[in-house]
Design a protein with these regions (language model features):
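Conserved alpha/beta-hydrolase catalytic His-Asp/Glu region
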Residues: 112-171
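Conserved serine/cysteine hydrolase catalytic core
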Residues: 140, 150-206
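Conserved hydrolase catalytic core segment
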Residues: 50-92
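Post-His helix in hydrolase/transferase enzymes
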Residues: 228-240
Length: 247
């Protein structure tokens, strides 16, 4: 739904399931996913075109690292509530990755409990609407999730992404952001949800300090998943950002 409300002059390209390509197996600090993103952009952008990288959470941070390494591919960067491990938190996460603690301080442990199969006659919209993660989603975004993340197989419907991979995404969250400090050369904006519990001030302030070219905007409402809670308004916010960048 968000994509449908972006300015029509933009052609949206996106990796179907980041970190699920066997050519780019998930690894620590998401280095292979950065390579996957760069390769995808190189292969899918038009000749002489540059790409506006727009990402949420995992995708936002991969977009940031990609833009730092290959600024020639991008004209702008819009990050929506990325998980920024800065300051003391990055040392905690570096240690936690070596222990089971990482399953407790990230959603990795909960992810492994995710239901993966439903009977084909079950009302999935009703099912997901009751879940904590989805309860504040725009109804159309729940439908978008169902149509993109679930496929029918015989009498049942199954998740079409790997929950172990999803858990490992959390387990390998980058703790090396200082290595990218000062490398961001493209116009960039960080948009955070007003009530986010992920990209919180204590984590984003050090990031903004080491990336002075990034402009921070606080979206007027919403939590970490605000792009799926208010897709139309977030699309308009992104459009406004791009208009200002292009002035």
């Amino acid at each position: 739904k968000l994509f449908n409300h972006l300015p029509k002059q933009y052609n949206v390209i996106a990796i179907d399931k980041l970190a699920h390509n066997p050519q780019y197996p998930l690894n620590d600090n998401w280095q292979n996913q950065v390579a996957e993103m760069i390769s995808f952009v190189e292969s899918n952008k038009g000749e002489h075109e540059k790409v506006v990288a727009v990402g949420h959470s995992f995708g936002a941070l991969v977009s940031y690292m990609s833009a730092c390494l290959r600024p020639d591919l991008f004209s702008a960067l819009v990050m929506l509530d990325p998980p920024l491990m800065t300051g003391l938190a990055r040392y905690l996460f570096r240690f936690a990755k070596k222990t089971r603690l990482i399953n407790k301080i990230t959603p990795a442990g909960i992810t492994l409990l995710r239901k993966q199969k439903w009977h084909r006659e079950q009302d999935l919209h009703a099912y997901f609407s009751k879940k904590v993660l989805f309860k504040d989603f725009d109804p159309d975004c729940i439908n978008d999730y169902i149509s993109s993340a679930i496929s029918e197989q015989g009498d049942h419907m199954h998740l079409n992404f790997d929950v172990e991979t999803e858990a490992n995404i959390f387990r390998t969250i980058p703790h090396n952001l200082p290595t990218y400090a000062g490398k961001l050369k493209v116009p960039s904006v960080l948009i955070t949800g007003k009530n986010t519990d992920v990209c919180v001030p204590v984590l984003r302030k050090p990031f903004l300090k080491t990336n002075p070219s990034v402009t921070h905007i606080e979206f007027k409402k919403g939590k970490h998943m605000f792009p799926l809670e208010y897709p139309v308004e977030v699309a308009h916010a992104i459009a406004n950002v791009l208009t200002n960048i292009n002035k």
